[in-house]
Amino acid sequence: MPASKEASEHQLTAIENGGIPMFTRIPAMPTANIWAKQFAQKTGAKYLPFGLKHEMVVAGGVRIFYDNFKDTDIETMWSVFSTGVLSRTLQIALPKTKFNAVAVARNIQEGELGRAKFYSHDRAFLKPSRIQTPFDSIQTYDAKGWELLKQHGQQGDWFWNVAGNMPKPTIKPSDIDSSREWGDFKDFEKHYKD
């Protein structure tokens, strides 16, 4: 988990639901993936990349999306874009649909977009959207995609809402020591096999 002065609600919820907190300062998502893979190798765990960027996840998603939408005429679909797995999977499953991808958290690299038209939200990741969605949506994530759909979309466009809000955790940030210095891997090291 990314270290910070205070654990986020998402981190607290994960801990409350049985997640083992392992905090460290993370310079960038690719580095976090490298560290997670190394941790899995050292402990005998199964490595699942962030965003579930794995061929089996994509294959399963394509099958599910195709089966559920094959008889639906979707001209244009919007979604937020982080790792791009959802957008690219939908693009494979729905080859006749036009896609719009709204980046909310990172710079997009060559080849990640597939055939989606790219938009980038101008607010920092942890700053909420300027508008409220008419459905349950995370204001710092999906709502930013909805905001750009409302600015640039057309009547009849579809929007993929990744997630709604979760219940507030009962544990408090003060209950968890989530602050770490750069290079502090003590939470990881206690799980390594000798």
Segments predicted by a language model, with ranges:
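Short, acidic/turn-prone active-site loops that include or flank metal/cofactor-
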Residues: 2-5, 26-28, 102-108, 163-164
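Small/polar-residue-rich loop-to-helix segments that shape phosphate-bearing ligand pockets
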Residues: 3-73, 115-127, 132-136
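Gly/Ser/Thr-rich loops at beta-strand to alpha-helix junctions
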Residues: 4-6, 54, 79-90, 141-144, ...
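Short hydrophobic beta-strand segments
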Residues: 42-49, 73-80, 155-164
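Buried hydrophobic packing segments
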Residues: 64-68, 86-90, 142-152
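Aromatic-anchored, glycine/proline-accented short structural segments
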Residues: 70-112
